[in-house]
Amino acid sequence: MTWLAGGSLASVKTATTVLLDPDKKLRAFGFEAEDEYNQLVEDSEEDGIGERTYEKYYYFRQFKMSLYNCSGVLTRNTMIEDETEKKLPAMLVISLSIGYMKNHLLTLINKRCIGVEENDIHWVITIPAIWDDSAKQLMRESAINGGIQSDHLSFALEPEAASIYCQLVKVILSEEGTSTQAGAKRKSFRSSRAGTTYMVLDLGGLII
């Protein structure tokens, strides 16, 4: 699954950014949310009470880091602050985000595959290793509110998921010979073998 950044740049990741209408309905997610909010700011006009139009919207930019930085215990009652200092329940923001990504993926699957039903999918959400039970419960309830069935949902710790990815990702073994294209090398790929050494680094919330 790829996302468009800036209208043309394709990326396998997108921003954890959400734009909600004044009535708290999801308007846009990811790079699209950033683009739409920037446009709202540019086109904004003052209303009769001196409030700019864009200030009526809820804009949570990179809200995943807000969850990392929440003071105290992260619970189902935790509130997070948007870019204009308006607060909403973290559970609402997470639920809308998960629901969007779920529906986005299902739409792509239906376009590319035949016979895949929603019940065929088991969803795995990665969470920080330092999260306690209350934070995990927040994420579980958010996922269920986002439309994922409880019996089709599992969690994996982010470092463990990164480690499994390192074991399964195919790496270039060698470049030898030439392909049918002049000057192009023929590459050999394989997954890591038993005994392969690798390192998973945590850079301030970003897992490599």
Specify the residue positions occupied by each region the protein language model found.
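Gly/Thr-rich phosphate-binding beta-strand-loop-beta motif of the actin/hexokinase/Hsp70
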Residues: M1-W3, K56-Y58, K170-I208
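Phosphate-binding loop and its immediate beta->loop->alpha context
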Residues: T2-G146
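Short, flexible loop/turn elements at secondary-structure junctions
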Residues: L67, A129-W131, L157-E160, D202-I207
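Phosphate/ATP-binding catalytic cores across multiple sugar-kinase/actin-like superfamilies
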Residues: L96-G115, C166-F189
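Extended hydrophobic secondary-structure segments that form protein cores and membrane-embedded regions
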Residues: I121-P128, F155-A156, Y198-D202
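Short acidic, glycine/serine/threonine-rich loops at helix termini
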Residues: K136-M139, Y165-V169
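Secondary-structure transition/capping motifs at alpha-helix termini
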Residues: N145-D151, S174-G177
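Conserved phosphate-binding/catalytic loops in two-lobed NTP-binding clefts
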Residues: G147-A161
